[in-house]
Amino acid sequence: MAEAGVEILCVGTELLLGDILNGNARWIAERLAGLGLPHYRQTVVGDNRQRLAAAAREASGRCRVLITTGGLGPTPDDLTTESLAAAFETPLEERPELWDEIQANLSAGGRAVAPSNRRQAFLPRGAAVLPNPLGSAPGMIWSPLPDFTILTFPGVPSEMRAMFEATAEPWLRRHGGATGVFVSRLLRFSGIGESNLAEQVADLLEGVNPTVAPYASLGDVKLRLTACGSSAESAAALLDPVEAELRRRTAQHCYGTTDDSLASVVLALLQRSGQTLSVAESCTGGGLGAALTAVPGSSAVFAGGVIAYSNAVKQQLLDVPAELLERHGAVSDPVVAAMAEGARQRLGTDWSIAVSGIAGPGGGTDEKPVGLVHLAVSGPDGCEATAERFGDRRGRGAVQQLTVIRALDRLRRRLLAQS
């Protein structure tokens, strides 16, 4: 056998087409890491008997445990159980007690029992049932070869998770071949690109235990730190000095950890200082307010905002002088500064953020192209306005998202400077 450990095989044409994000694989991978189980490969196959069987046979030559999700339902395209049986040349057998349980579960849920549901009562000879407390699709645990075990779960996330926690985790703790306990942390960064961040921490990226790996998404860069130890405490002790060094080198670019968002960090800083916030939005159309109010408890410091899309609303609700709009245009430093000051005065807050830009795809000029955004942060120590150029290649939604991220980060840095 080339490798030990656990592999994940996710079944469903909808996954290959991108209709559904593969959240099951991510969730299982996190649980395997927490159990200290080596996990080196994930595979996705469509609803096809031959390819599914081939994937299972290939996995049997690499790993000790194969976890599958999907394809356990009653419809003709639910092929996992019969394909696995065919892959290892094992006959399917009906389990009368399982069929009785499936019928009882369907009836208890007020659902009609269809003849096709009977397919779910067939398992390969020698397989044991993994009960499904939330649905009609049972899984199985089956060892078709020496030192190779398959655990199957439905694709419905809530059903898969309940079954995994109740049945798979206890079994994996005993038989999975854990090599230690893995602990991971995520550090989040803003205002720095992935390549620049990687240069600053290049030597730490070469570490083996802990490992440090960069990940980038729109407007956000992350470093995942992972360590393996004999216990969670020993693994955490390996992470602590590396995290401290990363924070030292990156200074204010690091804004939080795994569960933090820029909005939650900004709100926490405001609450700590006993200050309040308002927003004035044009090109983001409420995106700033949405990001802030997505954080539970935001009402303690976030007073509200004005979506001032037209010049008339900028004048009427934010007291932006008409001559500023005529002289500089709505997308300009003077206008966003006036918007921020107007919101701060009208809503009676300590701080205010204002944004105005050209999100596209049309409306740009040579002087003010698509992707140009002006941001202003007004606070007790004055108002600062700046321009950002996000370009026109990413599209309207990306410009709006980047504007929200950059505006919140500007406020975060101002709040840190005052503390």
From Swiss-Prot:
Q: CDD domains from the entry?
A: cinA
Sorted alphabetically, which InterPro entries does this protein's record hold? CinA, CinA-like_C, CinA_C, CinA_KH, Competence-induced_CinA, MoaB/Mog-like_dom_sf, MoaB/Mog_dom
Q: Which Gene3D superfamilies match?
A: 3.30.70.2860, CinA-like, MoaB/Mog-like domain
Can you tell which superkingdom this protein's organism belongs to? Bacteria
Q: Name one Pfam family in it.
A: MoCF_biosynth
Q: Which SMART domains match?
A: MoCF_biosynth
Q: Which family does it belong to?
A: Belongs to the CinA family.
Q: What is this protein called?
A: CinA-like protein
Source organism of this protein record? Parasynechococcus marenigrum (strain WH8102)
Mind giving the lineage of the organism this protein is from? Answer: Bacteria, Bacillati, Cyanobacteriota, Cyanophyceae, Synechococcales
